[in-house]
């Protein structure tokens, strides 16, 4: 998860990472000016950053002079997942949680979004659950909410300053109240905003917490405690 800025943040590095993230999450090749518009940076600066990323092989330029992920980005992603051991440790635990017949998910918080490393509905092969969903707003996600609750109110306020907050029409005070409730419970229970009347139950893992595990589906209140117990056990083993 993102930490608060230190005394001397490197703005050039921050801009480079913002450019890298925007490129990584774009579903199709994107031009320099459009990418600059998305992240609110000067096109000249973004052009220099993209050319540097292309030189490093992290980005690549298409025939029509747009940019997309290069081989270096995929190598970095694979190396980080392999070196951390997170997926290797998580897969057996996630597979065990599928016994409840609900969707099983593993994700991490990045700014105001959640990136799902694993998301498998009932009946889906576990291998197909890897990387099948991209970014989602943290406040509509059980994993996002339980990881936001690990942050202090000041940090959460800085993330959402001047922004509309999905699922929280009354804004920041409503979100902070919900996060306080999650901290007290030790888990998140989030209603899915559609007509299925589904809920998500999620817990955090790690010390400090850096990843979330969740079950989602038709989960009545009375069915929540055993799911929380199973999630906590999985989170404990994942954090070892």
Q: Model regions: which residues?
A:
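Conserved beta-strand cores of small sensory beta-sandwich domains that regulate signal transduction
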Residues: 60, 105-107, 190
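Charged catalytic carboxylate motif
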Residues: 15, 45, 89, 174, ...
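Amphipathic alpha-helical effector-binding/dimerization core
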Residues: 65-161
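N-terminal helix-turn-helix
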Residues: 1-83, 239-240
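Amphipathic alpha-helical regulatory segments at dimerization interfaces
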Residues: 22, 49, 88-100, 181, ...
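Extended hydrophobic
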Residues: 168-239
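Short amphipathic alpha-helical signal-transduction/dimerization elements
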Residues: 24, 148, 152, 232-240
């Amino acid at each position: 998860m993102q930490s608060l800025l230190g005394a001397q943040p490197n703005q050039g590095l921050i801009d480079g990472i913002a450019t890298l993230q925007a490129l990584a999450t774009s579903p199709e090749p994107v031009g320099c000016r459009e990418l600059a518009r998305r992240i609110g940076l000067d096109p000249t600066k973004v052009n220099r950053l993209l050319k540097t990323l292309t030189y490093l092989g992290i980005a690549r330029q298409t025939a029509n002079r747009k940019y997309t992920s290069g081989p270096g980005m995929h190598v970095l992603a694979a190396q980080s997942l392999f070196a951390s051991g997170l997926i290797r440790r998580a897969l057996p635990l996630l597979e065990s949680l599928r016994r409840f017949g609900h969707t099983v998910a593993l994700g991490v918080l990045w700014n105001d979004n959640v990136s799902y490393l694993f998301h498998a509905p009932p009946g889906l092969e576990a291998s197909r659950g890897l990387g099948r969903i991209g970014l989602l707003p943290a406040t509509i996600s059980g994993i996002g909410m339980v990881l936001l609750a690990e942050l202090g109110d000041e940090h959460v306020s800085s993330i959402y300053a001047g922004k509309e907050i999905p699922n929280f029409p009354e804004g920041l005070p409503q979100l902070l109240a919900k996060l306080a409730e999650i901290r007290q419970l030790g888990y998140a229970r989030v209603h899915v905003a559609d007509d299925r009347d589904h809920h998500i139950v999620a817990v955090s893992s790690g010390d400090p917490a850096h990843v979330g595990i969740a079950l989602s589906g038709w989960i009545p209140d009375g069915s929540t405690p055993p799911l929380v117990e199973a999630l906590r056990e999985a989170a404990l083993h994942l954090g070892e």
